[in-house]
């Protein structure tokens, strides 16, 4: 009986921790590399130049505004 209560409390506590942490990191999960790069590059004097749609790109250092799919900006 005591073990069951301890397990229920532990599960509720861990669920609450997950919900609190999920609010803080909602947008960081999608594109962490791109957001980190944009944060370092976007200062007052620099602005990101986007490649036009259907322009060739690579997955490592893409400069597409949205996505690089099958080596082409979308």
From Swiss-Prot:
<feature type="disulfide bond">
    <location>
        <begin position="64"/>
        <end position="73"/>
    </location>
</feature>
<feature type="disulfide bond">
    <location>
        <begin position="50"/>
        <end position="65"/>
    </location>
</feature>
<keyword id="KW-0800">Toxin</keyword>
<dbReference type="GO" id="GO:0090729">
    <property type="term" value="F:toxin activity"/>
</dbReference>
<feature type="modified residue" description="Pyrrolidone carboxylic acid">
    <location>
        <position position="49"/>
    </location>
</feature>
<feature type="signal peptide">
    <location>
        <begin position="1"/>
        <end position="22"/>
    </location>
</feature>
<keyword id="KW-1015">Disulfide bond</keyword>
<feature type="propeptide">
    <location>
        <begin position="23"/>
        <end position="46"/>
    </location>
</feature>
<keyword id="KW-0960">Knottin</keyword>
<protein>
    <recommendedName>
        <fullName>Conotoxin ArMKLT2-041</fullName>
    </recommendedName>
</protein>
<keyword id="KW-0528">Neurotoxin</keyword>
<dbReference type="InterPro" id="IPR004214">
    <property type="entry name" value="Conotoxin"/>
</dbReference>
<dbReference type="GO" id="GO:0008200">
    <property type="term" value="F:ion channel inhibitor activity"/>
</dbReference>
<keyword id="KW-0732">Signal</keyword>
<keyword id="KW-0873">Pyrrolidone carboxylic acid</keyword>
<keyword id="KW-0964">Secreted</keyword>
<feature type="disulfide bond">
    <location>
        <begin position="57"/>
        <end position="68"/>
    </location>
</feature>
<keyword id="KW-0165">Cleavage on pair of basic residues</keyword>
<dbReference type="Pfam" id="PF02950">
    <property type="entry name" value="Conotoxin"/>
</dbReference>
<comment type="similarity">
    <text>Belongs to the conotoxin O1 superfamily.</text>
</comment>
<dbReference type="GO" id="GO:0005576">
    <property type="term" value="C:extracellular region"/>
</dbReference>
